[in-house]
UniProtKB/Swiss-Prot annotation:
Induction: Expressed with a circadian rhythm showing an increase during the day and a decrease at night under long day conditions.
N-acetylalanine PTM positions: 83
Protein name (record): Triose phosphate/phosphate translocator TPT, chloroplastic
Functional summary from the UniProt entry: Triose phosphate/phosphate translocator that transports inorganic phosphate, 3-phosphoglycerate (3-PGA) and triose phosphate. Functions in the export of photoassimilates from chloroplasts during the day. In the light, triose phosphates are exported from the chloroplast stroma in counter exchange with inorganic phosphate (Pi), generated during sucrose biosynthesis in the cytosol. Involved in photosynthetic acclimation, a light response resulting in increased tolerance to high-intensity light.
GO biological process: phosphoglycerate transmembrane transport; photosynthetic acclimation; triose phosphate transmembrane transport
Gene that this polypeptide is encoded by: TPT
InterPro entries: Sugar_P_trans_dom (IPR004853), Tpt_PEP_transl (IPR004696), TPT_transporter (IPR050186)
Family, similarity comment: Belongs to the TPT transporter family. TPT (TC 2.A.7.9) subfamily.
Membrane topology qualifier: Multi-pass membrane protein
Compartment list: Plastid, Chloroplast membrane
Transmembrane portions of the chain: 105-125, 138-158, 172-192, 222-242, 244-264, 281-301, 313-333, 361-381
Naturally occurring in which organism (per UniProt): Arabidopsis thaliana
UniProt GO cellular component terms: chloroplast membrane
Amino acid sequence: MESRVLLRATANVVGIPKLRRPIGAIHRQFSTASSSSFSVKPIGGIGEGANLISGRQLRPILLLDSSAINGGEKREILKPVKAAAAEGGDTAGDAKVGFLAKYPWLVTGFFFFMWYFLNVIFNILNKKIYNYFPYPYFVSVIHLFVGVVYCLISWSVGLPKRAPIDSNLLKVLIPVAVCHALGHVTSNVSFAAVAVSFTHTIKALEPFFNAAASQFIMGQSIPITLWLSLAPVVLGVAMASLTELSFNWLGFISAMISNISFTYRSIFSKKAMTDMDSTNVYAYISIIALFVCIPPAIIVEGPKLLNHGFADAIAKVGMTKFISDLFWVGMFYHLYNQLATNTLERVAPLTHAVGNVLKRVFVIGFSIVIFGNKISTQTGIGTGIAIAGVAMYSIIKAKIEEEKRQGKKA
């Protein structure tokens, strides 16, 4: 900006011949020049925007009239002007590209890493809590409560700015939040009842329920290729369930209810499409889901917690560790869900779908290593087949969605 203003300031001085006199002559001639030999010329008007730098007006300066100074003197005067213009061009004209802007794949890779890392840590810490505090309804409330407090603090400092909500948007978000709450609680009931790896194997069936709901409830036509890709998922889950050493019906049925709940959440989410950003939408859903989860937690687990639940947990690990575990598991739960949303915004649906499958592989693998869960050969093979089927389904579905978008653009 400064270079453009300075160059414009010199526009009134024209016809620069070769240098004939030394610069000292300028001062002698200027001191003897009559008052008519020079005039005051402001550099452009405010309306033209020529005198504004960073919102401040430049003070008018005295420019010697062409009759008062010969060509050589003009050239000497213009030297510092040109030098300043060149210096300004070097600093303001050539904006350096930031490191992160130059290598966006590093940022995306960091998002994927943090998404996986937080998800694995959440699942491990969550299961450790259930080993000494088997109250999934209460823990589910803590997950949402910590996330809601985090959102409220973020809103208070304007990161992000809270988006206003009206009664119409609230009506469409309530069904989404109810399904989110039900799916979250039943997932935790399953995590508490069986091995983490088995729960995630059962939850691999979620795409099957999504396809079934789209076909038979929403009336959407599902290509045969998608149905065929789901066959290995069903087969793999069946194989893993038959020989799972930690199998029990509470864990199995709870994971299946979670799949159905999250399927309906997806259906209601499509009906609740809004211009609000995903961070604010997730915050409002978390707040509503928290109020949905509190009553059943009080009814189902309240008396047990007051009688001996809290006391037993504190006796086993101590008050400080008990409270810190609940706080951090809630933070990890909220942050990994937020990172999943942020990652989806940075990559194509196909990349995110593959990443989601790999995330489940990471969680299953790490849970087996950390907790030393013994699995049979058939369970391992069944889990592998189910994950491969989910990968096939995710890739095919993402390609179909991309073709639809390209068709709409054309």
